[in-house]
Amino acid sequence: HYPALGDDVPEGAVRSAQHEDINFITLLVGASAAGLEVMDHDGGWIAVEGNHEHIIVDSGDMLQNLTNGLFKAVTHRVVNPPDATSDRYSMPMFTHPRDDVDLTPLPEFIARTGGEALYPSISAGEFLRQRLIEIGLIDDD
């Protein structure tokens, strides 16, 4: 939920800073207002047009690890839509493998991405734990 903003907040101001999702895949059912943007290959931003008839599929860091970078985690952000005076609702479904699932890059993806593993051998549970520590959501103990 992104609460309505006052008239003094500029259109295009960032509401959720650029990031990639930690999980495997995110499914996003059409948001109630515009604002989602994805980064293109040149570092520019592309507005994502979604509605109640669309499901937006966003690959995350875990999928990037498993595919040795063939499928990149999508860098995205949320900016103020032209009408930021109304609430914006978004219903993401973050999918995670079980903690014991091995996210070691698969041989077929290593072969397709230059022949060398670019990402670590790690379980989904340890991957999530490390990332949550990195962003300060849990302590390293």
Region annotations inferred by a language model:
Residues 1-141:
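C-terminal flanking tails of non-heme Fe-dependent oxygenases
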